[in-house]
């Protein structure tokens, strides 16, 4: 069994990423982070909406909850499925918001902050929370096809990851 050695350069690099800088440095990172073009904002919204559609449609495809909704909304079995769907989407959406914020913090000082990816994740989480609330209080369902939602999510995420937003 070999021991894992942590080099000083690895720990100092991690400490440098996690440690906040001065107020002026962080203010500069923050102002660079929110300077997006209109087409970049479209990609962010695309990531968010297609992500929520993919999560909701995957859940619907696995459980068949849409068939039950068409039949009757007040059956106890349907009510349990909708409550489970609400809990799953709200948890995943909260994780997306937290993950997007953490990722934005970790990438804040880099030359390419992956703004489209982190803002898309955070916005997707926020829209997911709103979608979960509509399920909880109005019993709505999503009609977008499962395959289209996952393909569009993948396309927007890849677009957000690979597009250089630093203006170079």
UniProtKB/Swiss-Prot annotation:
Transmembrane segments: 36-56, 86-106, 115-135, 143-163
Keyword match RNA-binding: no
Residues modified by glycosylation: 74, 164
Entry keyword annotation includes DNA-binding: no
Keywords of this entry: Glycoprotein, Membrane, Transmembrane, Transmembrane helix
Annotated localization: Membrane
Coiled coil: none
Membrane topology listed for this record: Multi-pass membrane protein
Gene Ontology CC annotations of this record: membrane
Protein name: Uncharacterized protein R513
């Amino acid at each position: 069994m070999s021991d894992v050695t942590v080099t000083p350069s690895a720990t100092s690099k991690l400490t440098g990423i996690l440690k906040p800088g001065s107020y002026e440095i962080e203010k500069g990172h923050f102002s660079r982070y929110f300077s997006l073009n209109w087409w970049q904002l479209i990609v962010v919204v695309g990531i968010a909406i297609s992500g929520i559609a993919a999560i909701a449609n995957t859940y619907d495809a696995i459980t068949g909850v849409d068939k039950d909704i068409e039949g009757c909304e007040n059956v106890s079995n349907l009510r349990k499925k909708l409550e489970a769907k609400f809990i799953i989407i709200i948890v995943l959406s909260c994780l997306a918001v937290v993950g997007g914020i953490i990722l934005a913090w970790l990438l804040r000082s880099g030359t390419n902050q992956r703004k489209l990816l982190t803002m898309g994740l955070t916005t997707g989480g926020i829209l997911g929370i709103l979608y979960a609330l509509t399920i909880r209080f109005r019993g709505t369902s999503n009609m977008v096809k499962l395959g289209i939602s996952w393909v569009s999510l993948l396309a927007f995420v890849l677009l957000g990851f690979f597009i250089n937003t630093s203006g170079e």
